[in-house]
Amino acid sequence: MLSNSSILITGGTGSFGNAFVPMTLKRFNPKRIVIFSRDEMKQWEMAKLYKDDPRIRFFIGDVRDKERLRRALDGIDFVVHAAATKIVPPAEYDPLSVLKPM
């Protein structure tokens, strides 16, 4: 199902993305995998691992930014939503800090 498809993974530089991307490349032959995350440093580090693989693309953005997400979804067949807030207590104390109206 994922072979020859375009996949967007939100939060793609996190622990799930770092496991999902190599597994997907090994088990399937996707047309492209777009790593969508807001962490430029983690994207840079991950890009070094896949510098010779033209199927891997990187897209800086936040899932709370509707227009940026819409641009990232262009031509995408499947979405794996792995974006999350890692530090939960501050979000529980101030839920509005992690929300953005769309």
Regions found by a protein language model. Give the residues of each.
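A short, basic/flexible loop-to-alpha-helix module at the beginning of a structural domain
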Residues: 1-5, 87
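N-terminal Rossmann NAD(P)H-binding glycine-rich loop of SDR-like oxidoreductase domains
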Residues: 5-27
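SDR active-site strand-loop-helix element
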Residues: 10, 36, 79-83
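Glycine/Thr-rich phosphate-binding loops of Rossmann-like dinucleotide-binding domains
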Residues: 17, 43, 88-89
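Conserved glycine-rich Rossmann-like NAD(P)H-binding loop of the short-chain dehydrogenase/reductase
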Residues: 28-42
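Short alpha-helix adjacent to the SAM-binding motif of class I
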Residues: 42-49
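NAD(P)H-binding glycine-rich loop region in Rossmannoid oxidoreductase-like domains
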Residues: 50-100
